[in-house]
């Protein structure tokens, strides 16, 4: 899915819709294959934050790409340090979310941080350790549009409308 996202964000940049960067995971190389100039063994330096950060029409965004093969997403796949980073990002005025691929269904969803926070809190209070496909809002279904394989800007716009309505209430 990350290749599809990378392709989409390259097109967003080409069309001046967004500037989004893939954040590399910090590693320490241990073994190198000099003949092929490849790292063959490495360790993670520290916990990474999210997969992508950028700006869309003046709005800072950060998000992670996740995939699951069943109709439920185990929250253990979303680490506490990632949730903390997304929360702090939102407190600074940004928008945080994940793009979740249900590979068995061939569908992708934009899941806003506030919904992730609800599911995470439910888990911490002794509830389910996952959330189901049918708990997600259909308005946040991410569909391909022409060459935009993971066209999430429409879902982001829906999220912005929801946030604006929440702020007015």
Give the role of each language-model region.
Residues 45-49, 56-60, 91-93:
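Short connector loops at helix/strand junctions that flank enzyme active sites
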Residues 52-70:
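Conserved catalytic cores of phosphodiester-cleaving nucleases, focusing on short active-site segments
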Residues 8, 27-33, 40, 47-50, ...:
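Non-catalytic C-terminal interaction segments of nucleic acid-processing enzymes
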Residues 32-38, 64-72:
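Short, basic, glycine/proline-bearing loop/turn elements
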Residues 66-92:
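Mg2+/Mn2+-dependent nuclease catalytic core
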Residues 39, 45-49, 78-86:
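Short acidic (Asp/Glu) patches
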Residues 87-117:
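Nucleic-acid nuclease catalytic cores
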């Amino acid at each position: 899915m990350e290749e599809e996202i990378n392709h989409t964000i390259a097109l967003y940049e080409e069309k001046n819709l967004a500037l989004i960067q893939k954040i590399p995971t910090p590693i320490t190389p241990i073994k190198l294959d000099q003949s092929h100039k490849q790292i063959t063994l490495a360790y993670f330096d520290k916990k990474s934050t999210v997969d992508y950060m950028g700006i869309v029409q003046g709005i800072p965004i950060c998000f992670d790409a996740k995939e699951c093969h069943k109709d439920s997403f185990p929250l253990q796949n979303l680490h506490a340090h990632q949730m903390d980073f997304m929360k702090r990002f939102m407190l600074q005025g940004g928008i945080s979310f994940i793009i979740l691929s249900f590979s068995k269904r061939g569908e992708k969803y934009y899941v806003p941080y506030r919904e992730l926070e609800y599911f995470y809190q439910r888990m911490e209070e002794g509830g389910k350790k996952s959330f189901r496909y049918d708990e997600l809002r259909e308005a946040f279904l991410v569909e391909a549009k022409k060459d935009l394989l993971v066209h999430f800007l429409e879902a982001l716009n829906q999220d912005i409308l929801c946030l604006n309505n929440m702020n007015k209430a």
